[in-house]
Amino acid sequence: MEIAGTYTFNAPPDRVWNILMDPQVISSCIPGCEAFEPLGEDRYKARLNVALAAITGTYEGTVVLADKVSEKSYRLTAEGQGRPGSVKGSAAVSLRPEGDVTVVDVHGTVQAAGPVARVGQRLLAGVSKMMMDRFFACLQGKLTS
């Protein structure tokens, strides 16, 4: 299933890039993140507790940031497993200046297996988009505080 979002930040690309690359900020903004530990350069072990409808559960997995072009783009891949099943996702993230703001575009895919996949693509798509919206809203808050 495909997911996409566009987010506007009241900051220049360098500030937005720096916050997107900061593991402490990332972990504090991922909804339900209980752990986010470095495994090496741009690779992290994560544990999320998701409490939403039929996909409620704890997921453990990895997050990797790759193909980085400073202040312009990167690719994020994540995969995790938990009692409700497994989830794998990948997203292209791009930044572009527009006047005094920076626009971040996200285009990706999410795949699920096991019981979590049986809840239906619409529910999973909605939950994925909601978590992504919360993540970027948190980042915007970090930039303005």
Regions found by a protein language model. Name each.
Residues 37-79, 134:
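Glycine-rich portal/gate segments that line the openings of hydrophobic small-molecule binding cavities
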Residues 137-145:
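Short, highly charged C-terminal tails/helix-capping segments
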Residues 1-43, 47-51, 145:
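Hydrophobic ligand-binding cavity/cleft-lining segments
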Residues 2-6, 43-45, 58-60, 73, ...:
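Intrinsic-disorder/low-complexity, polar/charged segments enriched in Ser/Thr/Lys/Arg/Asp/Glu/Gln
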